[in-house]
């Protein structure tokens, strides 16, 4: 994680909860990357970070796998809506 943030440090933000890192969010080529510490998941930290980065970069988007229900809920809570589906050949 830290190597990834260091490589794209102008595009990433660390979220603090009680002065300790509890998640990070960033953007690469318009695509949001977000991660919340498991101890803070389900407490609105993810949707808070999504809302805040959207204020800074209103034209970003998210690509989320259909089975990642918690991410879908966090983005919907932050005001995002489903727009497209990606279809891939069966493996």
Task: Indicate residue ranges for each PLM-predicted region.
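Short glycine/proline-enriched coil/turn segments at helix->beta-strand junctions
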Residues: 8-9, 27-31, 54-61
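Conserved beta-hairpin
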Residues: 10-23
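Conserved beta-strand-loop-alpha-helix junction that forms the acyl-donor binding cleft
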Residues: 62-81, 88-90
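Active-site rim helix/loop that mediates acceptor-substrate recognition in acyltransferases
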Residues: 1-11
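Conserved acetyl-CoA-binding loop-helix of GNAT-fold acetyltransferases
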Residues: 42-56, 69-77
């Amino acid at each position: 994680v830290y190597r990834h943030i260091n490589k794209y440090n102008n595009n990433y933000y660390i979220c603090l909860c009680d002065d300790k890192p509890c998640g990070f969010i960033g953007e690469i080529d318009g695509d949001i990357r977000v991660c919340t510490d498991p101890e803070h998941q389900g407490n609105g930290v993810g949707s808070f970070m999504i809302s805040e980065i959207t204020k800074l970069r209103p034209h970003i988007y998210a690509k989320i796998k259909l089975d990642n229900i918690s991410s879908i809920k966090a983005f919907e809570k932050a005001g995002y809506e489903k727009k497209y589906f990606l279809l891939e050949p069966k493996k």
